[in-house]
């Protein structure tokens, strides 16, 4: 899938789940499950509850997301 097909949104991490999955509340109020992107995993970027993150959603499944950026 091309990167142009993704939807980028801001959200806040609510809680950590097993196997590097997170529950994320988006700015529009929806709660989705998200996993860390490969580059973030490769550079050992840690994500904790309360962190502001940028996620990518696909138009095919709006209940799952990929975390691509953690705000400082």
Curated annotation (Swiss-Prot):
Native organism taxonomy: Bacteria, Pseudomonadati, Pseudomonadota, Betaproteobacteria, Neisseriales
Every S1-like domain range: 1-72
Main localisation: cytoplasm
UniProt GO molecular function: ribosome binding; rRNA binding; translation initiation factor activity
Zinc keyword on record: no
Pfam families recorded: eIF-1a
Keywords: Cytoplasm, Initiation factor, Protein biosynthesis, RNA-binding, rRNA-binding
This protein's GO CC annotations: cytosol
Coiled coil: none
Localization, UniProt: Cytoplasm
Functional note: One of the essential components for the initiation of protein synthesis. Stabilizes the binding of IF-2 and IF-3 on the 30S subunit to which N-formylmethionyl-tRNA(fMet) subsequently binds. Helps modulate mRNA selection, yielding the 30S pre-initiation complex (PIC). Upon addition of the 50S ribosomal subunit IF-1, IF-2 and IF-3 are released leaving the mature 70S translation initiation complex.
Record-given protein name: Translation initiation factor IF-1 2
Organism: Chromobacterium violaceum (strain ATCC 12472 / DSM 30191 / JCM 1249 / CCUG 213 / NBRC 12614 / NCIMB 9131 / NCTC 9757 / MK)
The organism's place on the tree of life at top rank: Bacteria
Protein family membership: Belongs to the IF-1 family.
Self-association and partners: Component of the 30S ribosomal translation pre-initiation complex which assembles on the 30S ribosome in the order IF-2 and IF-3, IF-1 and N-formylmethionyl-tRNA(fMet); mRNA recruitment can occur at any time during PIC assembly.
């Amino acid at each position: 899938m091309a990167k142009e097909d993704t939807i980028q949104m801001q959200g806040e991490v609510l809680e950590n789940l097993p196997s590097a999955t997170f529950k994320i509340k988006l700015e529009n109020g929806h709660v989705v499950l998200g996993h860390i992107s490969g580059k973030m995993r490769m550079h050992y970027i840690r994500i904790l509850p309360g962190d502001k993150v940028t996620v990518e959603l696909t138009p095919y499944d709006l209940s799952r997301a990929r975390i691509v950026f953690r705000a400082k």
